[in-house]
């Protein structure tokens, strides 16, 4: 055997060995192997992962929105209760210097005109134009039987204490801002006319009864005339017992 044939045979053996090894390796990595199929089945696809992330974000946003709405409603209720309590406290609290303040500023409506505004007893069946179910001053609902004062022109109704307190410092309706100056001037003008009519001087007749003074009563006694008799008549004032002294002198 020559030296040239040895390398060729060795090279052929090496090629056969490598070819068998590669084919055996390919058989081990068969694409139809159960383990390989299971690995492909378990691996999640990118589309499914994206959909899961999107649904999770939507649920989180909805949860945050619902929690925010609940917190806003609770905060609104707390603020409303606090304002209602503070308003009722201010109404029930006496104002010591109210007369002096009104005298100096003269902003509110006089009590004489305020008392002429109509007062009604509230009932849910009432159907008055402009009358609501809530007092906008104290933010509390009207209860059946409560006394409400109605303002002229706009016919808006409020609690008597609330609107009296308001109109002591303002001249307008707290809801529609309707000015009440003309109405008050008309009411006060009618009052002034009524006062002038009642203030006219009247004639007063005074009858004084004075007791009568005692008067003198004259009693004359006539006796038959005799020659020797002289009749003397004396006039004396009336005594308390009504006795009359008659003196007859016989000469």
UniProtKB/Swiss-Prot annotation:
One of its GO terms (cellular component) is membrane. Keywords: Membrane, Metal-binding, Transferase, Transmembrane, Transmembrane helix, Ubl conjugation pathway, Zinc, Zinc-finger. It comes from the Eukaryota. A zinc finger (RING-type) spans 135-177. Its main location: membrane. GO terms for biological process: protein ubiquitination. It catalyses: S-ubiquitinyl-[E2 ubiquitin-conjugating enzyme]-L-cysteine + [acceptor protein]-L-lysine = [E2 ubiquitin-conjugating enzyme]-L-cysteine + N(6)-ubiquitinyl-[acceptor protein]-L-lysine. The RING-type zinc finger domain mediates binding to an E2 ubiquitin-conjugating enzyme. This is RING-H2 finger protein ATL10. It comes from Arabidopsis thaliana (Mouse-ear cress).
